[in-house]
Amino acid sequence: MKTLIKNATLVNENELQVADLLIEDERISRIGANLHPKGDYQVIDATGKYLLPGVIDDQVHFREPGLTHKATIATESRAAVAGGVTTFFEQPNTVPQTVTLERLEEKFAIAQKSSFANYSFFLGGTNDNLEELKRLDPKACAGVKLFLGSSTGNMLVDDEKTIEAIFSNVDLVIAAHCEDEATIRKNLAHYQALYGNDIPIDLHPHIRSAEACYLSSSRAIALAKKTGARLHVFHLSTAAETELFRNDIPLKDKKITAEVCVHHLWFTADDYDTRGALIKWNPAVKTAEDRAALWQALLDDRLDVIATDHAPHTLEEKQQKGYTNIPSGAPLVQHSLVAMLEKAHKGVISLKKIVEKMCHNPAILFDIEDRGYLREGYYADLVLVDMNALWTVQKQNLLYKCGWSPLEGQQFHAKIVSTFVNGQLAYNNGQVCPTPYGQRVTFNR
């Protein structure tokens, strides 16, 4: 099967180029002007549209196994391809937790049957599974995930000797959720003394505070420098944390890297008034000054990748009474790319920089094989975008199993027209193909 995409504006490797792109089977076979391949092929006229590499989201929670009333790998990967996300790395805080090699392979087996996007997973670290982490083949999965602050699923790793042993012995990316547990507990106790469990939601960033984030991130970075570990700090949310990261060496040479999430680039603490607990995340959405600093650090390359931390809960769960009863997290994977393209429309970030942070850099950071770029011989994971097709996020166009979005009512100028996964048309003009084409991601390690 061949598909010829004609006259697209390719956004790739810091260039915009009008060209044709030929897909043969799973791969990009040719890129150039006025291609006329031999034999039968389908033609897509992409005049006036932009062709991007598929987005690689390095942090999602798809809730399977065990929490499938919220989401499944099938439902959320459908939403992903509708949003231009062709590869995801899923987190270990499912039920049961993904903390053994056996549980890890069980997840791969689920995804092999049901994932519409390419997939890999993180093996979770705990206070007592160091030997399991040592047995992990570096090529087997995305990396190891450590919760250095407690969050959904209660996978807190708080034994300092264990953390240092993991940093010293794990020979692949260690992705860390960094919030200082003692600081959070102290802050929570303070506000519970004032409000009981009816703590106003706008105090969430005071409980899961900037201080808690900085303490934990700085401690993890110091330990990574001491041990030589390959540390990737997830979801930076504060101005202070951005000062901990470098931009004076290429990403491929960095041992310590950072991710920022769409919601920390989009919302501020002012939005708690209108969105309430729907925008309760860990780490918390913080001040406008924090958001501005995150944008600056993203644009000057101290922050390396943009992701979602897609973390669905049911609307009933999010609308519960009582601060500690309300789970943190929200669905975003269907809207991460269009949200960033909206920022491009407003002149905040360039298309080239979006592709760098959402496509190229995750591939570099995780040593992903043959994905993340528009290159001959690479897998044809592609997104065709119309930059001028105004539409509104509404319940009826959501594909998340949970059926809600923190972005409902938001207008976007950019629209995903088509998404290709491994050369197959996975999404086209509002419809997801019924066949899941996702494959297990392989790594050059």
Please provide the spans of the model-predicted regions.
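Histidine-rich, glycine-flanked metal-binding segment
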Residues: 1-4, 9-53
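Histidine/acidic residue-rich metal-binding segments in metalloenzymes
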Residues: 131-147, 152-306
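C-terminal cap of metal-dependent C-N hydrolases
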Residues: 322, 376-442
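Short catalytic-loop micro-motif centered on adjacent basic/acidic residues
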Residues: 90, 120-123, 230-235
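Alpha-helix-loop-beta-strand connector modules within alpha/beta enzyme cores
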Residues: 101-117, 165-176, 335
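Metal-associated gating/positioning segment near the N- to mid-region
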Residues: 49-114
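Divalent metal-coordination and catalytic microenvironments
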Residues: 8, 21, 26, 48, ...
